[in-house]
From Swiss-Prot:
Keywords: Ribonucleoprotein, Ribosomal protein
Organism listed in the record: Latilactobacillus sakei subsp. sakei (strain 23K)
GO MF term set: structural constituent of ribosome
Protein name: Large ribosomal subunit protein bL31B
Entry GO terms, CC: ribonucleoprotein complex; ribosome
Quaternary structure, from the entry: Part of the 50S ribosomal subunit.
Any GO BP: translation
UniProt cross-references to PROSITE patterns, sorted A to Z: RIBOSOMAL_L31
Amino acid sequence: MKQGIHPDYHKVVFMDSSTGFKFISGSTANSAETVEWEDGNTYPLIRVEISSDSHPFYTGKQKFTQADGRVDRFNKKYGFADKNAAK
């Protein structure tokens, strides 16, 4: 690799703004805000809006919607009844 062209890769603490959940990970992101981690070291703090602690997919609060196909949407739009549904 060429020297001096790659960003500095270091450990960063990410904090979920909605739940306060924190985790440490490697990143090239920089922040002026710092926080002391459980190991006693100080790391840059990056605030994120959503993480695995608050995302509906990971929390089990995911809502599924019925995705209609193109034909179903056409029939609903123009008022055609499904012949098989009447039987």
